[in-house]
Amino acid sequence: MPPKRRQAEDTSDAEPQYTKKSKGNTGKAQPQELTKGSDQDGNTFWELGNNRRISSSVFRNTTLVNIREYYDAGGKLMPGKKGISLSLAQYQNLLKVIPQLNADLRAQGHAIEDPGFAQVAEQTDAPIETPKVKALESNKESIKKEKKKPRKSNIDVTSDEEEAAEDEDDDE
């Protein structure tokens, strides 16, 4: 067995002791009040904080809800790559999910307020019905109905079997 290493004696008190700095604020982030504004195109937006905005806009005759990160380009805030544009149907689905999401976050131990959603009953396990989900369910039902139909066997009779069947018919 190799000899055990001896620990170096800590005799030098002259060396500085370094401690690790904690990252960021140790306290919980407080929700900011949303400030309403308007961009150069006339679209209304609300500041979410940290150069993030939520706004509505029209693109090719379609109204979109944008949640996007912005960057400073020479004193002018420009939209960045990070973000999402939701159609109105997707936005409606998001609004339906928010009470359930809040309940899930509360279950994880986060303090979440429900401004504007206090009237809505929280449905923790209720499925969200979308047109696509309904279409998939109707497809599944039609496939099940097709499976219930009796099927004819797909067996080809070989020439040897045909001759044997003809011989039996001739014998009768």
From Swiss-Prot:
Family matches, as Pfam families: PC4
Any Gene Ontology CC annotation: transcription regulator complex
| Region feature (Disordered) | 1-43, 123-172
User: Could you tell me the keywords of this UniProt record?
Assistant: Activator, DNA-binding, Nucleus, Transcription, Transcription regulation
Q: Tell me the superkingdom of the source.
A: Eukaryota
Origin organism is Neurospora crassa (strain ATCC 24698 / 74-OR23-1A / CBS 708.71 / DSM 1257 / FGSC 987)
| Record's subcellular location | Nucleus
Q: Which GO terms describe its biological process?
A: positive regulation of transcription initiation by RNA polymerase II
Biased composition annotated in UniProt, kind: Acidic residues: 158-172
Function text: General coactivator that functions cooperatively with TAFs and mediates functional interactions between upstream activators and the general transcriptional machinery. Binds single-stranded DNA.
Query: Is Magnesium a UniProt keyword of this protein?
Result: no
Q: Where is the composition biased (Polar residues)?
A: 24-43
- What spans are recorded as compositionally biased (Basic and acidic residues)? 131-144
Major place of residence: nucleus
InterPro entries xrefs: PC4_C, ssDNA-bd_transcriptional_reg, Sub1/Tcp4-like
- Select a single GO molecular function from the record's annotations and give it: transcription coactivator activity
Q: Which family does it belong to?
A: Belongs to the transcriptional coactivator PC4 family.
What name appears for this protein in its UniProt entry? Putative RNA polymerase II transcriptional coactivator
